[in-house]
């Protein structure tokens, strides 16, 4: 392997070690959230607001993780989030995938679809997870990895 490959592997291993520590120390929620990967400050502020609005996020890691994704500025600014009973209620309706969902960038559509797949809701074939893994850039991968750490915080 080239040196560049070793550096990439070391960076990925470091990221997974950080995510593991987040899971281990998830009982201190303020500390837990301060170490999250956020695309920018607005992402973090949106996430904190959604956690207050969706009170069941405290006891439901799936809702917590959905709030993290919904807080992404591109999504948060496209959706009337405070009119939804659940964080992803806006994704599809009786007619299928909504125009709001279709208006998101393709990588974010895959991210939302992959998060829905955790609850056995499949809106794409091939799956959002499959398409995301083949198309996400490193920042989008980090968002997905962070999402998995949130929903699995009770794993240890």
Each language-model region and where it sits:
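Extended, charge-biased low-complexity segments
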Residues: 1-107, 120-156
């Amino acid at each position: 392997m080239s040196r560049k490959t070793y550096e990439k592997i070391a960076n990925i291993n470091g990221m997974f070690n950080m995510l593991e520590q987040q899971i281990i120390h998830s009982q201190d929620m303020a500390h837990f959230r301060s170490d999250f990967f956020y695309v920018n400050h607005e992402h973090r502020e949106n996430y904190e607001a959604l956690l207050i609005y969706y009170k069941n996020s405290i006891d439901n890691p799936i809702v917590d993780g959905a709030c993290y994704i919904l807080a992404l500025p591109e999504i948060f600014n496209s959706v009337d989030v405070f009119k939804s009973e659940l964080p992803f209620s806006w994704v599809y309706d009786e007619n299928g995938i909504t125009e709001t969902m279709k208006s998101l960038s393709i990588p974010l559509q895959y991210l939302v679809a992959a998060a829905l797949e955790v609850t056995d809701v499949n809106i794409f074939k091939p799956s959002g997870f499959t398409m995301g893994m083949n198309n996400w850039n490193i920042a989008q991968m980090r968002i997905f990895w962070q999402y998995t750490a949130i929903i699995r915080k009770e794993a240890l």
